[in-house]
Amino acid sequence: MTMAGGRRGLVAPQNTFLENIVRRSNDTNFVLGNAQIVDWPIVYSNDGFCKLSGYHRAEVMQKSSTCSFMYGELTDKDTIEKVRQTFENYEMNSFEILMYKKNRTPVWFFVKIAPIRNEQDKVVLFLCTFSDITAFKQPIEDDSCKGWGKFARLTRALTSSRGVLQQLAPSVQKGENVHKHSRLAEVLQLGSDILPQYKQEAPKTPPHIILHYCVFKTTWDWIILILTFYTAILVPYNVSFKTRQNNVAWLVVDSIVDVIFLVDIVLNFHTTFVGPAGEVISDPKLIRMNYLKTWFVIDLLSCLPYDVINAFENVDEVSAFMGDPGKIGFADQIPPPLEGRESQGISSLFSSLKVVRLLRLGRVARKLDHYIEYGAAVLVLLVCVFGLAAHWMACIWYSIGDYEIFDEDTKTIRNNSWLYQLAMDIGTPYQFNGSGSGKWEGGPSKNSVYISSLYFTMTSLTSVGFGNIAPSTDIEKIFAVAIMMIGSLLYATIFGNVTTIFQQMYANTNRYHEMLNSVRDFLKLYQVPKGLSERVMDYIVSTWSMSRGIDTEKVLQICPKDMRADICVHLNRKVFKEHPAFRLASDGCLRALAMEFQTVHCAPGDLIYHAGESVDSLCFVVSGSLEVIQDDEVVAILGKGDVFGDVFWKEATLAQSCANVRALTYCDLHVIKRDALQKVLEFYTAFSHSFSRNLILTYNLRKRIVFRKISDVKREEEERMKRKNEAPLILPPDHPVRRLFQRFRQQKEARLAAERGGRDLDDLDVEKGNVLTEHASANHSLVKASVVTVRESPATPVSFQAASTSGVPDHAKLQAPGSECLGPKGGGGDCAKRKSWARFKDACGKSEDWNKVSKAESMETLPERTKASGEATLKKTDSCDSGITKSDLRLDNVGEARSPQDRSPILAEVKHSFYPIPEQTLQATVLEVRHELKEDIKALNAKMTNIEKQLSEILRILTSRRSSQSPQELFEISRPQSPESERDIFGAS
């Protein structure tokens, strides 16, 4: 018996787009492309297109749906542009275009393009169909086509009228755009229906098809069950008791029952049924063929109007009999037996054919699983079966007594018949009417006879038997024996072993319902959301319908190893036969692989792989369809025969999935783990080479596809146009950003000037107002080149006095920013003491700047001069923290305005190397800065303490003043005061 889910079928919402396209397209060659990704990559191609183009499915995946990879030198450029425009505008169109197969053979194709929409009416896919029309086009003239002259003339004659092409596209001319959805099916030659949408939806049925599990059909089945029992009761009764249909009311009732059963036949032609795989079959053609092959003939024979035909045959006899008012009515008296035997003929034949109506019980048999779904109905049905058996036995028991009570030879009544004994017991003996009809009359009434017959059969079936009605003749005794045998069997089976029957017949069903109850309790206990709960329940029902509650692993464990391997090979035969990678595998290798395979059943919406999850299995799709989603876009649709996962045999590391793999329909996957596959490949070395060479993954989850969405491209284009149309941003001259960039530009110019000054060192001269370097005796001093930053803001001139070091007393230095302490005045004396932190910044700045200059080879040694004269007109910036010294002159202009006589002779051969600041100096500076920061922090803490004390004192004074003042004074104090008044108040306090 099947459980409720199996009877109902698999009715969860699923995306059957791929199955519908494949079913409707028949032998059409087509590909599906994603309409939301740039270049519209191919996400699915059927076997027909692969065979037509010569490419494997894995080779065309992710290539453009325009099939640009099949273009060649003879492909028309205008047609290529029209194809691209059709994709860009999401239009339906058809083209004749020349393309090239994988072996570069030119082929003429009739290409038809149609957009596929989802539930939001958004184009998500493109369906492109290809028809080979090379035979109807002029052969392509090249070196490989010599000798085709006759064929060329023939094809030119065929294509002159273009009649064949019109048959290929009866309603769509070349280049014609079709905008009406109703013509989509006609364009693509997929039938009269509109192309399905790419969305998840519940199984739909045509308007004239009835679901077998709907409320109406369930109610109708119960009505048919009741009428079937009505037929099973009345047909044997009417045949045994030879009841004529002289009662118009009963004739009308029987006719209505016949009409209802005829209507049931019509409904069966429009009622869905459950297929062998658990799917709901709603195709009208399949429904009709299935019913015609199974129960149609039996149902038709059981519905013929035998009562109506019999009534017309006996109309004269019934009228004559009803016209005699002295006769006993047939409702109360048994019809004369002799008269019934004398009037045999067509009427008796049709009366006997009423038994054919018992074939209606077949309806109960084939729909028994509908009724036993309810526990109380099972017990009622069993009791009804027992009572129906007793009723049939009672009718047969009366027929035996009616046949033996009259002796045909002597025209007398047999005294040993049970009917004669019953007539004598109840006081209604039989009497012979010699003066009238000359027939036997009287006897027990029909009701008494039926009740007595049923009483006898029930006592016999239950093995009770009181003996007040007992068989006397041989036939009666034989029948009594048969009744007792049947009764013992029925009694023991139905009543004695009801519990055993339920356990044996419904063990799987009980286990199924127990599992469902456990799952329901679990979902209710943990308050699982409704959507997820429905998915869980649907998955359990679908899995049970596929496995029928059989634990495959448990069964395989019972079998020995050799038998278990044979069973596994049989279970995975589809994978081994469909994929060429297993063709060269030996029997032992196949058996080893089959032992490692696992069968996985997936419900619609299940995620087989999540993005970022480890890919540790190789999956073969046996049935159903799946979609691969990367960045919320469908990048591939996988169907029967596809393989996805990772190339474990080529990669040493475990891969992470770059996309989600989600089931669109109910799917059956054959999965093998990574470690198990590698173990088999390591053992069977010869097979491993063939396997790695021939197995082509339809989609490799390790690789991430790089694409750009059309929506992103359009958005970027809109932003670019928006920026282009916007007015440029204008910053005022005194804007901080503009000043910052101006400072960077000036510093760059100063560095370039320093470099040029180093290169022109031989001609260097010092202009008026700059510091001069003199040459004294034989001692030479290194003069530092300064990088001077010039700002637009006016600077305060600061006089500078060159300080002589102990080592070089007669030399002056051109001071760099921050290199020396500058006094506020130009006179002699010591420089004011500067902060250690400023000196540390100056030292670091000098170290970095001088190193850069040294690396750029822009620092040149300056020769010694004989005299030191003049002063450098240096300026200090008005910045309070930078301390950068500025000059009105630039180093690249040094020496240009000086006269030759003012210049000192340059000793080119005397060079002084530059040495950066020693590390000990930096360390000392850092320690000094650290000590100074500690002192500053202590000073700040002391100031904060003083401020807190002052605030506390102020609060205390305010509190005391408030407590000592009147409300009027408080009101006056609360008024706003000027800053001067506030200072006066606080000062006074």
Curated annotation (Swiss-Prot):
Annotated motif Selectivity filter: location in the chain?
Answer: 463-468
List Phosphoserine occurrences by residue: 974, 978, 981
Q: Where do the PAC domain residues begin and end?
A: 93-145
Which CDD domains does the protein's record reference? CAP_ED, PAS
What Pfam families does this protein map onto?
Answer: cNMP_binding, Ion_trans, PAS_9
The segments annotated as topological domain Extracellular are: 242-248, 310-345, 400-448, 471-477
How does it get modified post-translation?
Channel activity is regulated via tyrosine phosphorylation/dephosphorylation by SRC and PTPN6.
The reaction(s) annotated as catalysed by this protein in its Swiss-Prot or TrEMBL entry are: K(+)(in) = K(+)(out)
Can you tell which superkingdom this protein's organism belongs to? Eukaryota
Biological process (GO) annotations held by this record are: cellular response to calcium ion; myoblast fusion; potassium ion transmembrane transport; potassium ion transport; regulation of cell population proliferation; regulation of membrane potential
> Region (Required for phosphatidylinositol bisphosphate binding): which ranges?
151-162
Instruction: Give the record's glycosylation annotations as residue positions.
Output: 415, 433
Chain ranges passing through the membrane: 221-241, 249-269, 291-309, 346-368, 378-399, 478-498
What keywords sit in the KW lines?
Calmodulin-binding, Cell membrane, Cell projection, Disease variant, Endosome, Epilepsy, Glycoprotein, Intellectual disability, Ion channel, Ion transport, Lipid-binding, Membrane, Nucleus, Phosphoprotein, Postsynaptic cell membrane, Potassium, Potassium channel, Potassium transport, Synapse, Transmembrane, Transmembrane helix, Transport, Voltage-gated channel
Result of mutating residue 496 to R?
In ZLS1; gain-of-function effect; increased conductance at negative potentials
Give the start-end ranges of region Disordered.
Answer: 855-886, 962-989
Q: Where is the PAS domain?
A: 14-94
Residue numbers spanned by region CAD (involved in subunit assembly): 924-964
Annotated tissue distribution: Highly expressed in brain and in myoblasts at the onset of fusion, but not in other tissues. Detected in HeLa (cervical carcinoma), SH-SY5Y (neuroblastoma) and MCF-7 (epithelial tumor) cells, but not in normal epithelial cells.
What free text does the record give on domains? The segment S4 is probably the voltage-sensor and is characterized by a series of positively charged amino acids at every third position. Conformational changes of voltage-sensor are driven by an electric field generated by a potassium gradient across the membrane. The C-terminal region interacts with the cyclic nucleotide-binding domain and contributes to regulate channel gating.
Please give the function described in this protein's UniProt entry.
Pore-forming (alpha) subunit of a voltage-gated delayed rectifier potassium channel that mediates outward-rectifying potassium currents which, on depolarization, reaches a steady-state level and do not inactivate. The activation kinetics depend on the prepulse potential and external divalent cation concentration. With negative prepulses, the current activation is delayed and slowed down several fold, whereas more positive prepulses speed up activation. The time course of activation is biphasic with a fast and a slowly activating current component.
From the record heading the sequence, give the disease linked to this protein. Temple-Baraitser syndrome: A developmental disorder characterized by intellectual disability, epilepsy, hypoplasia or aplasia of the thumb and great toe nails, and broadening and/or elongation of the thumbs and halluces, which have a tubular aspect. Some patients show facial dysmorphism.
What protein is this chain from?
Voltage-gated delayed rectifier potassium channel KCNH1
Q: Which organism is it from?
A: Homo sapiens
Its lineage opens with:
Eukaryota, Metazoa, Chordata, Craniata, Vertebrata
